[in-house]
Amino acid sequence: MRDRLAPHHLAREVGDRDAEVFGGDLDGGHAGAVGDQSQRAAAGAGAEGVVLADQAAVGEVGDEGGDRAVGEAGGGAVWAPMNTPAAKGVFRAGISESGAVTQPNDRATAPAVSQLFTKRNGLPATAAALRDVSKMRLRDMEDKLRAPGPDGSAASLLGLAPFADGTLIPATSAEVLKSGADQGIPLLIGFTAHEFAAASLSGEQPEVTDATLPAALGALGFAPAATAAFRAAYPGLTANQLAGQAQSDAVIRMPSFRVAEMRAGRDQPTWLYEFTWASNATEFRGRSFHCLDVPFAFDLLKATGVTAVAGDNPPQPLADAVHRAWVAFVSNTDPGPTWPRYTLDRRETMIWSDVPHVQSDPFAAQRPIWLQ
């Protein structure tokens, strides 16, 4: 699914129709993500690649106003480098689509994730060892890292991501967010309704029951009282479905919401969205899963692989609306007059559904969980 809807593949089909697109693949940053200390600022190597690529893009285009970074799944690798000293003046705006933006990325966590990666894959977590590993094998290795187990953690659940090394990334994403030290440039941020709820991040695992649900939520870092709160926020779901939704919330939806909340509290220009349109493809029917919004953002519903995951006849008017907002934001750092900024008094959020609309405080039921 990730390959079929990968943004850097879809970007090749955009051409120069609406905006100049520089596509990149963060797989080359795996060595930095696992914290290989054999190279300078290695823990942030993936983020360093983003900064260097954007510096090159700005130089190529000649836009003195700065670049606009867009990341899907790697949205966290957009937000993290956007707030590094090296990126000052490079970015004019950012879009984080389904980004894991406040994952545990302190320097002490990096070696722990690196050691677990090596333990589960039998390969040293170094740049030299991973340099010639195929992309598919890297993804298999990442799945092993994220598999549940007594030696796992919230950080390993996320997998590979930029870590604060004290140099390129001086502070963790959470520290930057709480301190208000982020650069405060315009940010468009959001997620899909279900993300990974339909299929576990870590592949096969035992079905969660009512009896094991509290433990499953605890493994994600939620307090025991969260069980009742999740049932209230997502009525009608089975224990197994709740566990899947909680996983999606913990990794992507909750952190993104926190970023919007904290930025809004500092009156920094922020726009929040939820993509709720659901696939009608047999394998994914009724689910708004991770990556489904990407072909809508690029307005490429007829691109290779889209029908297999979105189903027949995905709504072109929705793609027109999403794409129009993305292009407007990239061009003017504002998605348009029909999408208001996110503020704490109204919490207006764009809902990308069959009929796109703005809804006030759509996450009122989840907020007590997400802001704890």
Regions inferred by a protein language model and the residue ranges of each:
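Short linear motifs in low-complexity or flexible loops
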Residues: 6, 11, 18-22, 30-33, ...
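C-terminal, loop-rich substrate-recognition/catalytic regions characterized by aromatic stacking residues
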Residues: 182-231, 313-317, 323, 354-372
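Active-site rim elements
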Residues: 100-105, 164, 173-174, 237-250, ...
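Substrate-access "cap/lid" subdomains that shape
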Residues: 88, 93, 97-216, 243-265
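Alpha/beta-hydrolase fold catalytic core
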Residues: 222-266, 271-277
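Mobile gating loops/cap/lid regions near enzyme active sites that modulate substrate access
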Residues: 201, 254-372
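Short glycine-enriched nucleophile-adjacent loop
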Residues: 75-87
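Alpha/beta-hydrolase fold nucleophile elbow
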Residues: 66-72
